[in-house]
Amino acid sequence: MNKEIINQMKKRIVILGAGESGAGAAVLAKAKGFDVFVSDFSSIKPKYKDMLDAHGICWEEGRHTEADILNADEIIKSPGIPDKAPIIKKLKEKGTPIISEIEFAGRYTDAKMICITGSNGKTTTTMLTYHILRQAGVDAGLAGNVGNSLALPVAEDPHAVYVIELSSFQLDNMYDFKADIAILLNITPDHLDRYNYEMQNYVDAKFRIIRNQTAEDAFIFWNDDPIIAREIAKRHPQATLYPFAETHEAGVKGYTEDKKIIIETSNGTFTMEEDLLALSGTHNLYNSLASGIASKLVDIHDENLRASLSDFTGVEHRLEKVARVRGVDYINDSKATNVNSCWYALQSMTTPLVLILGGTDKGNDYSEIEELVKKKVHALIFLGVDNAKLHGFFDGKVPVIEDARSMEEAVAKAYKLAEKGDTVLLSPCCASFDLFKSYEDRGDQFKACVRNL
């Protein structure tokens, strides 16, 4: 649709949430001539207030004034605001269109979009893909769930390519946006509290990443994920398919053979010794294959791809080695906010473990990690306000179980319980909002406490 017509149709845009995505969307909307109002039910960080003020954008914090919101022609909603929020219910009753910042920004750029989602591995794959492109000299921007607005660079510092991490919450409010390259790493239960505890609702959200794709576009996915396989058979994606797997299965475009990774695209075949990959572990092999396929599809030269796959340093709060104290390794995996992420972490561990679990439960099924916990963990520390569900599942399955109400207490108890040669692993399985501002805050506190031992 012609962008001028959209402007005429959508005179007033109200943005709910004034974090990174909301503030960026406000700047872009203002630049495109809309009447813009920003409302945040919480407090707005000073840097975002300054940004809004500098662009002459009206805002409010600590409330949602209905008279200033319900008159909107279109709403741009922060992904953190659930559909059950009272203001969202009223907007839906009124029939006001509600979109995401990514959807809005996509209207105003013709850049190539490489979009990544999945229950686990999406941040690592996003950062790795971005690293590969930038090292190869591509004019690439980084956006989405990694903490960067897409709208702000579209408004003020446009790029030729964007590498975008997409959460299910962002995908929920995307309609006309199209990914040129879509990557779906895996689907396991997560955020079910936001999806009425219906797994299919979450699956449907993830598959929105292939919405509007044509045969000119690419869909990269893990070939051995049973949910993805079922949904592909049901949905018949229009995009050209690029499955990846650990072994050379029929039809896969990325795989390993004879201790090499092999990637096959129309831009040629890429090979690399598997032991030269910077990221170790099976889950990171999949991340490297997905990034490698995407990179070959945008014609990154083999020598650039090989160099970047071998020198990438990883993602903070994801299996991050913090320190070794008196023969005990401390690993920060605070980004493991679901059970499957913790499963990958436990699978990669080779020493006896003291495991720190807990936080805000999102409908978790801990049976997925039960056998690994019984096999590898000799002490559990439950870090949270309400640990009843954890006790109900794990009591009697591990020799020692302790509770902690702060990170300082959790690390102090782990220090006493760990023996030389052990690893203390923070891999919580849960969201962080009971005791911490975010998973980053939780991980930062863990690192600070470890360094103070």
Positions of the model-derived regions?
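Residue-level signal for inorganic ion chemistry
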Residues: A29, I75, I116, N145, ...
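Residues in the short beta-alpha loop(s) of Rossmann-like NAD(P)-binding domains
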Residues: G19, F41-S42, V146, D224-D225, ...
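Nucleotide phosphate-binding/pyrophosphate-handling subdomain across enzymes
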Residues: K3-N7, K11-R12, G22-K32, D139, ...
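Short internal beta-strands
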Residues: D35-F41, F219-N223, I356-L357, K376-V385
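Beta-strand->loop->alpha-helix junctions that form or flank phosphate-binding loops
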Residues: E60-R63, I99-E103, Q238-T256, S308-S310, ...
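Phosphate-binding loop of NTP-binding sites
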Residues: K30-A31, A67-L70, P79-N223, I227-A239, ...
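C-terminal helical cap/extension that packs against the catalytic core
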Residues: K49, S367-D422
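N-terminal leader/targeting and accessory segments in enzymes
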Residues: M1-S100, F104, G392
